Amino acid sequence: MVNYPSGVRAGGYPQKKKNQNIRYGKRGMGLEEMINQANDYYLVNHQAVIHKKPTPITVVHVDYPDRSMAKITEAYYVQPSTTDYNGVVSGKYIDFDAKETKNKTNMPLKNFHQHQITHLKNVLENGGIGFLVLGFTTLSEYYIFPASLLIKIWDKAKAGGEKSLPYKIVSKQGIKINSKMIPSLDYLPALKKLFNI
């Protein structure tokens, strides 16, 4: 597509105006990508060992258009995955999930699944640290939130209560993650503060 300097397209249609309220922080980087970058930084700097858990799948069919270009075309989940990440920080086992929403007022509980809640309960019952990294992308805010509170809210929702995790609760009961250059989502200080580790 060729555009003239005045912004008019070659086809005679004016170029669409772009939204002027652009936030440039963390541009183009999803929550998991930011966490992965932080985890690499923590590992290299001997601050923590945290890895993303692989999703267990069974591959059924693979296309080979070229020897070096295998493409999985059909696969199935072997079992429901638990949480996204686990590892060790200051000698403590940690296990957490990462969720983000564009919603400004709450994190819908439909973003979570029963098997994840059960897994986090098991982690807590066995002395591990379970938590969430929650992102409110429209607000450009990220929080560490304890799994114990999520579990209470989940149980209330199952009994007919509110079907979301309100932003007000997250911002009061969680710890806000401060942005940095490297890593862009430095969640370790917030984690250590919330759990006194």
Curated annotation (Swiss-Prot):
GO biological process: chromosome segregation; DNA recombination; DNA repair
SUPFAM superfamilies, A to Z: Restriction endonuclease-like
EC numbers, comma separated: 3.1.21.10
Cofactor annotation: Mg(2+)
Keywords annotated in UniProt: Cytoplasm, DNA damage, DNA recombination, DNA repair, Endonuclease, Hydrolase, Magnesium, Metal-binding, Nuclease
Region ranges (Disordered): 1-21
Catalytic activity: Endonucleolytic cleavage at a junction such as a reciprocal single-stranded crossover between two homologous DNA duplexes (Holliday junction)
Function summary: Endonuclease that resolves Holliday junction intermediates in genetic recombination. Cleaves mobile four-strand junctions by introducing symmetrical nicks in paired strands. Promotes annealing of linear ssDNA with homologous dsDNA. Required for DNA repair, homologous recombination and chromosome segregation.
Protein name: Holliday junction resolvase RecU
The organism's taxonomic lineage, starting at the top: Bacteria, Bacillati, Bacillota, Bacilli, Lactobacillales
